Design a protein with these regions (language model features):
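Conserved donor-binding/catalytic core segment of Leloir-type glycosyltransferases
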Residues: 158-179, 185-192
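Conserved acidic donor-binding segment of nucleotide-sugar-dependent glycosyltransferases
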Residues: 281-305
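Aromatic "clamp/platform" in nucleotide-sugar-dependent glycosyltransferases that forms part
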Residues: 248-249
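Short hydrophobic beta-strand element within catalytic cores of glycosyltransferases
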Residues: 266-269
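Nucleotide-activated donor-binding/catalytic signature segment of Leloir-type glycosyltransferases, i.e.
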Residues: 210-231
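A short, active-site helix/loop in glycosyltransferases that binds the activated sugar's phosphate group
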Residues: 100-143
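A charged, aromatic-enriched C-terminal amphipathic alpha-helix characteristic of glycosyltransferases
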Residues: 21, 25, 302-353
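Extended catalytic core of nucleotide-activated donor transferases of GT-like folds
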Residues: 41-112
């Protein structure tokens, strides 16, 4: 029995999974974790290390479904050919994305019926609470949920290149409401009025014409543009990033923030519960309001070396070592493989070492 991955928005171009958004990145991650896997798509094709198969041709595999709310419907479709469809939910976003009661109930039913793997402890807790509140008690008692922090490819980090003018990053690729882009713009405008900075925002193409993006792009100290062409370029830009200002109200994990921290940027975070899963307790740059955010970001770009020393002290001496111990994607890879083996009896070959593809 093999593995197939389904994400309705995934695009395959020139034999590879295209895009640098979180969904595409995670599909590539799963293909690396399960070599020779399939990707569910509209047209069958052989690609670089994986196959694309239409849903109606999926048979005899564990379907890792990233569109979790659809799993019961997928089960019925697969059941037409397969007497015992095997589906695992992969929740890689915060459950609060579903606000309508019908959507929340559908999510709860899906996670009650099918084993569910989550991208962080916080997400797993929210999933369990949703199932407990929305699903029948006997379904909740039988539900299976596991988690691991997504982590980052530590070997992707590049050597630091400190810029002549400090670079402040908008650490997201969208301008959705929960990211609070207006707060970001308010704070960076204040900081830019006090000291030279270059603010950079790399956004999904559809977001470039949104009002916050247009407003930011009109500032002489700001650059707004599309996502980088490759992961290599992405990490090269992070190596030249001085600081970032996180403003999101809610996150399931915060992969972009972890990557920026691993690259050496000083992160300024809101005082929100999700932040505790990203940085150590006592992290010095957590703000309660816009005034505190301004002061912290100003320090991060004008006294960066001192700020990094504070990060080291908060992490017991070495902030980078703390990050690498807690956000290495090896732990995620091992955990998801273990769950697929335990829940479905799928034999998996051991991963290679640090130089794995």
């Amino acid at each position: 029995m093999g593995v197939a991955v389904r994400l309705s928005s995934v695009r395959v171009e020139d034999g590879r999974v295209a895009g640098h958004d979180a969904g595409a990145t995670l599909v590539r991650r799963l293909l690396r974790v399960f070599p020779g896997s399939q990707v569910v798509g509209p047209v069958a094709q052989e690609c670089d290390g994986f196959s694309v198969v239409p849903l109606e041709d999926v048979w005899g595999v564990v379907l890792v479904n990233m569109d979790v709310i659809d799993s019961p419907c997928l089960w019925h479709t697969l059941r037409l050919r397969d007497p015992d469809p095997q589906i695992m939910n992969f929740v890689w976003w915060h459950p609060s994305r579903y606000e309508h009661p019908v959507e929340t109930s559908c999510l709860a039913l899906s996670c009650a019926l099918f084993p569910t793997f989550c991208n962080s402890e916080r997400t797993a807790t929210e999933v369990r609470e949703t199932v407990s509140a929305e699903a029948a008690p006997h379904l909740y008692q039988r539900s299976r949920t596991a988690w691991a922090n997504l982590g980052v490819r530590l070997d992707h980090a590049r050597p630091r290149e400190e810029p002549a003018v400090p670079v402040v990053l908008y650490p997201a690729i969208s301008l959705e409401r929960r990211k609070r882009p207006d707060l970001f713009l308010d704070v960076v405008e204040r900081v830019a009025a006090r000291t030279p900075v270059r603010v950079e925002a790399r956004l999904e193409e559809s977001q470039l014409v949104e009002e916050p993006a247009l407003t930011l792009s009109r500032r002489e100290w700001a650059w707004v543009g599309p996502l980088t062409a490759s992961r290599t370029t992405y990490w090269e830009h992070l190596a030249r990033t001085t600081a970032f200002l996180a403003t999101a109200w809610e996150e399931s994990y915060g992969l972009a923030y972890v990557e920026a921290l691993v690259a050496g940027a000083v992160g300024v975070f809101p005082d929100r519960p999700w932040v505790r899963g990203v940085v150590p307790s006592g992290y010095p740059f957590v703000y309660r309001d816009a005034d505190e955010a301004e002061d912290m970001l100003h320090r991060a770009v004008t006294d960066t070396a001192a700020c990094r020393r504070e990060l080291d002290r908060a992490a017991g001496g070495d902030f980078q070592a703390w990050l690498r111990a807690r956000h290495d994607d090896d732990a995620f890879d091992r955990a998801v493989r273990s769950c697929v083996r335990r829940w479905f009896g799928v034999p998996v070959e051991p991963l290679s070492g640090p130089g794995r593809p």
